[in-house]
């Protein structure tokens, strides 16, 4: 269960509660996150949908430098959804929304 102020800052949802299952691909090089948002309620319009909207509306990528990536993507119309937040000195995380409304998560490994 993921909840708390830091999580709401990353997603821009404020008070949230989400169950997450993290799976590793058989080759060990990638991971797939499955999320079920319990709080807040769900909104259906994907163009302005929050991070917890139903359906496949987001993907997450590992980046070497999250701030450099944000600067580069910002030049192409990508906007930060919530805040850039550190999770337990393990990851620096954020979500961005591209010009077509697709949500992209960015994760920088800190260790």
Predicted feature descriptions by range:
Residues 1, 55-61, 107-111:
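N-terminal beta-strand motif that seeds the catalytic metal site of vicinal oxygen chelate
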């Amino acid at each position: 269960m993921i909840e708390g102020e830091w999580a709401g800052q990353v997603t821009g949802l404020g008070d949230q509660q989400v169950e997450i299952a993290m799976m590793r691909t058989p080759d060990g090089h990638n991971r797939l996150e499955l999320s079920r948002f319990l709080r807040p309620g769900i909104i259906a319009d994907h163009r302005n949908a929050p991070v917890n909207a139903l359906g496949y509306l987001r993907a997450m990528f590992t980046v070497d430098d999250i701030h450099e990536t944000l600067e580069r993507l910002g030049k192409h119309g990508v906007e930060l959804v919530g805040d850039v937040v550190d999770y337990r000195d393990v990851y620096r995380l954020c979500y961005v929304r591209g010009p077509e409304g697709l949500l992209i998560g960015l994760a920088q490994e800190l260790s």
